[in-house]
Amino acid sequence: RLSLVGSEMCIRDRQVTASTTVINADGQDAARINVYYDKVKLSLDAVAFYDAKSNDVLDLSKFTIEDNTLVYTVTEPGEFSFWVAYKTHNTKDRPTTISAVEFSVPDAPEDPQPDNTSFVRRTLITQFTGLGCGYCPFMIAAMEDVRKSAEYADKSVLAACHTYGGDPYQPDVPLDYAMGVSTYPYVNFDFQTGIGNFGYNSNVSNIKKNIDKSLSVDAGAGISVGMEVAGNKLVARVTVKAARSGSFRVGAWVLEDGLTGTQLNNGMKGDYDFNTHNNVIRHVNSRYSGSDYSGHEVGALAAGGTGEHLFTMTLDESWVVKNCHVIFFVTELVDKGYAVTNAIDVPVKSSTIPFEYR
């Protein structure tokens, strides 16, 4: 089986590789960094390293160099973000970041069925809404009723994106722009299809049809997670296991439940609490480049092959951590773009989530 670990930041023929993107700030755990051009490893004497925040040149004499590899260790938590330049080429637009934390980086969960590639699949639903959107309750109610029904109870994960009219709970990136949202409410399924509001009954029918369409195709990959949470730091080692050969990316969104705000309602009736907002996107960690949030590169995998990505996220002090959870999703290259092929939703706490097989 093919196994990809560490991190690669590649722009055309320039490549920076790091053995890991998260280390324990114990002075021993290390990230080993190499620079390549046209697939040839470069001498570090020929490469300039720049601080990604200040764009100042870094003095490599302050780092450990072993066998033409920069070995990065640290005794204080923080981030080391840099880009490199070689002749007229550089990686400034896509810097590399090494995060140091005050606890051990989690291991990948053990695979309970190494020979199995048949995974439980869930649809990723992104619901675009806002407190000032009077017709949003017609979609919110429909979504709630579909997802709590016996038939659809465990077939999807939901992220609420509050991007309407300068909403106080808008996420930290413009997902509405990335997904081409021009009307509210709007619901996107797996970064592919979308629906607008046509009234409660039609919304229920359309949500079901799109979930059914998504799940009519088997999952292209499974997801396992080893997660550690200490204070306001979250580190997750996410493993992607391919069910079929393909190119994959992986992303993570932090959500929060129990947020309050008066919801404008243009007439949706029923026993719903429209003023309590759940599954609200707080942080997006899936930016590939520009306005593309399809996930971090895992790469090409053969069926049964695995790839990893390490996520490091800071939980804002204003969030109620016990009300937070994380969606991890995998996208797969289809036609000319990436579409979600599986997703899971897990609480924010130290935990081990193995692959879920059918």
Which sequence ranges carry the predicted segments?
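Local sequence-structure signature of Cys/Sec-based thiol-disulfide redox active-site neighborhoods
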Residues: P114-D154
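Single conserved hydrophobic/aromatic residue that forms the stacking wall/gate
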Residues: R1-G6, I11
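Short, solvent-exposed loop/linker segments at the N-terminal edge
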Residues: R12-Q15, S19-D29, M227-G231
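Short, conserved sequence motifs used for protein processing/export or organelle targeting and
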Residues: D154-R358
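Short tyrosine-centred short linear motifs in exposed loops/low-complexity segments
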Residues: D26, V74-F82, G246
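Extracellular recognition modules
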Residues: S81-A85, I327-F329
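Short, solvent-exposed loop/turn segments at the edges of extracellular beta-sandwich modules
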Residues: K87-D93, V334-D335
